[in-house]
C-alpha cells in the first residue's frame, strides 16, 4: 500500500542514495516531500520546512528508541535521549563547547596541528588530503578534547574504528560486535584518569567537573559520541570543503583574493554536501505530516542533503557559490534540541585547515587523474582527495 501511494520513493535504491542522491532527492522534494522508502524501510523527508519541523518536535519524532544503533554500543547519551534525560546529559557539555570557550582553548592548538601535518606533506608536492590532513587533524583534536593525550591518537583511532564498525553492523541488521565492546571498554578505562583531571585539562574534564548528577559511565558514553562525531563528520567537512573549492577555479580565486570569504565558503560547502546526510527519528504516535500517514513506531529519516538544496530557500541550489548570502541557513548541524554540540569546534577545524592549506601551498590543485566524488548513504565524503602543488624550495 505505501509503495503504491509513494511511487517515487518506491523506486529509489540504496545505490542511488549512496552514490548520487541529489537527482532522486530533488524529484522527491518536488513531488513526494515525505515519501515511503522501502529501501530504507522508513519515511524520507526531503523538504526543508518539514525537515525542521521533524527535528524540532522530539515529542512526536524521538531519538529515544531501542533501535538506535549508537545507543546499543555506547549506552544512553545525549544522542539517544530526549526530554529531561537529554537535557541532563547535554547540559554539562554546553559550557565547554560554547563558541568563546572553543576559540580560547583550541585556536592555537588546531593551527599548530594543521601546520605540523602540512609540514609533513609539503616537500612531496602531492598528497591525499583526506587521510593525510583531514582525518589526522580531526583525530588529534578529539584526542585533546577528550583528554586522551596519554593514550595517543593512534590508539584513540583504533577504539573509534571498532565502535564505528559495531554501529555499522547493527545498522545493517546485525548484532553489536565483540571488538566494539572491547573498544568502548578501552575508551572507558582511558577516560577514568582523564575525568579526574582539573577542568582546564580538557573539554570532557570540564564537563565532568560540572556533571550535574551524571555518573562517570554516563560521561564516558557521551565522550564516545563526541569521539564518533568529532572524527567522522569533521573529516568529511574538511575533505568536502577542499574538494568543492579546488574543483571550481573561479570560486577558489575569489577566496584567495578575499580570504574573509572562506568563512562563508565553509558554510556553502556544508550546505551543498553535508558530512552527515541523514538523521533518524522514530514516531511516538500516529501522525499525518504533509499528507503522509505516519504510524507510531515508524522510522522517519530526515534528509539533510535534501533539505539543504531546497529551491524554496536556496536559489540555484545545486551551484557552489562562496558569496551565497543565506548559505548559513543550511541544516548540516541539525536543528532543535539535538543541534550539534560540537559545531563550533568543527567549524574552527575546517576553517583553519583550509586556510592554512591555501596560505602555504599557493598553487594547490586537484590531481587531474583523480577527481573526488562524495559518496555514502549516511556520512558523505570523497574516498580520496588527491592534490598536488609545487614543492617549496629547500632552505639554503
Located regions from the model:
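Cytochrome P450
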Residues: 1-396
Amino acid at each position: 500500500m505505501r509503495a503504491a501511494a509513494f511511487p517515487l520513493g518506491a523506486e529509489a535504491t540504496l545505490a542511488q542514495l549512496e552514490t548520487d542522491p541529489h537527482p532522486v532527492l530533488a524529484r522527491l522534494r518536488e513531488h513526494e516531500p515525505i515519501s515511503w522508502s522501502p529501501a530504507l524501510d522508513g519515511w524520507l523527508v526531503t523538504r526543508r520546512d518539514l525537515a525542521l519541523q521533524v527535528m524540532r518536535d522530539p515529542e512526536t519524532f524521538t531519538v529515544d528508541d531501542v533501535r538506535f544503533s549508537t545507543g546499543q554500543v555506547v549506552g544512553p547519551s545525549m544522542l539517544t535521549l530526549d526530554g529531561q534525560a537529554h537535557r541532563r546529559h547535554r547540559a554539562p557539555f554546553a559550557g565547554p563547547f560554547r563558541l568563546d570557550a572553543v576559540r580560547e582553548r583550541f585556536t592555537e592548538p588546531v593551527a599548530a596541528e594543521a601546520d605540523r601535518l602540512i609540514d609533513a606533506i609539503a616537500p612531496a608536492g602531492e598528497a591525499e588530503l583526506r587521510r593525510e590532513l583531514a582525518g589526522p587533524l580531526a583525530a588529534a583534536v578529539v584526542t585533546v578534547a577528550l583528554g586522551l593525550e596519554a593514550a595517543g591518537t593512534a590508539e584513540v583511532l583504533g577504539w573509534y574504528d571498532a565502535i564505528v564498525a559495531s554501529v555499522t553492523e547493527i545498522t545493517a541488521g546485525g548484532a553489536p560486535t565483540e571488538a566494539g565492546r572491547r573498544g568502548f571498554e578501552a575508551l572507558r578505562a582511558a577516560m577514568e584518569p582523564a575525568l579526574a583531571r582539573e577542568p582546564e585539562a580538557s573539554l570532557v574534564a570540564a564537563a565532568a567537573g560540572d556533571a550535574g548528577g551524571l555518573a562517570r559511565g554516563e560521561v564516558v558514553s557521551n565522550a564516545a559520541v563526541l569521539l564518533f562525531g568529532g572524527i567522522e563528520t569533521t573529516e568529511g567537512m574538511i575533505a568536502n570543503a577542499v574538494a568543492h573549492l579546488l574543483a571550481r577555479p573561479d570560486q577558489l580565486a575569489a577566496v584567495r583574493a578575499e580570504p574573509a570569504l572562506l568563512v562563508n565558503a565553509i558554510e556553502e560547502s556544508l550546505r551543498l554536501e553535508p558530512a552527515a546526510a541523514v538523521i533518524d527519528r522514530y514516531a511516538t504516535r500516529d501522525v499525518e505530516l504533509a499528507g503522509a500517514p505516519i504510524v507510531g513506531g515508524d522510522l522517519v529519516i530526515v534528509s539533510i542533503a535534501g533539505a539543504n538544496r531546497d529551491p524554496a530557500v536556496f536559489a540555484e541550489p545545486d551551484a557552489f557559490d562562496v558569496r551565497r548570502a543565506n548559505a548559513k541557513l543550511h541544516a548540516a548541524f541539525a536543528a532543535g534540541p539535538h543541534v550539534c554540540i560540537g559545531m563550533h569546534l568543527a567549524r574552527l577545524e575546517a576553517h583553519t585547515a583550509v586556510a592554512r592549506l591555501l596560505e602555504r601551498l599557493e598553487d594547490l590543485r586537484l590531481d587531474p587523474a583523480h577527481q573526488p566524488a562524495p559518496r555514502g548513504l549516511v556520512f558523505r565524503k570523497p574516498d580520496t582527495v588527491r592534490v598536488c602543488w609545487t614543492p617549496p624550495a629547500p632552505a639554503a
